[in-house]
């Protein structure tokens, strides 16, 4: 079993992976929804690629903000995702960071590569 999802009553769920790590989800305002968790996971997956690619640099911070548009009809799939990456540190060549983001979306980030079949994914980069 790779994942176990259990309803906790009301509008909350606990997700447990095969290593016993847990994450809580919910709906109706009682937790992060599975839809938003998917969006968070897209950002996290790609940001991991960027941070890992800069592991030999003096990176002081990295973040990504995501804006989401969904279809109006069910299933309300993701149709557009805009990602704004912000990274800072000492001697971070913008070309290198750009290449890391491009490679993340082209081949490494599993989640963005799944989502790009229904959503147009765009991004911008701010290196400070």
Where do the language-model regions lie?
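Extended beta-strand/beta-hairpin segments
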Residues: 1-41, 48-128
């Amino acid at each position: 079993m790779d994942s176990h999802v259990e309803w906790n009553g009301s509008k909350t769920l606990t997700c447990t992976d095969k290593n016993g790590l847990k994450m809580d989800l919910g709906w109706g305002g009682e937790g992060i929804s599975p839809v938003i968790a998917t969006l968070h996971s897209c950002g996290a997956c790609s940001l991991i690629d960027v941070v890992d690619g800069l592991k030999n640099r003096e990176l002081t911070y990295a973040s990504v903000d995501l804006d989401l548009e969904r279809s109006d009809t069910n299933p309300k799939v993701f149709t557009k995702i805009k990602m704004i990456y912000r990274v800072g540190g000492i001697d971070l060549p913008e070309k290198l960071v750009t290449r890391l983001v491009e490679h993340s979306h082209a081949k490494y980030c599993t989640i963005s590569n799944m989502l790009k079949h229904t959503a147009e994914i765009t991004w911008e980069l701010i290196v400070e």
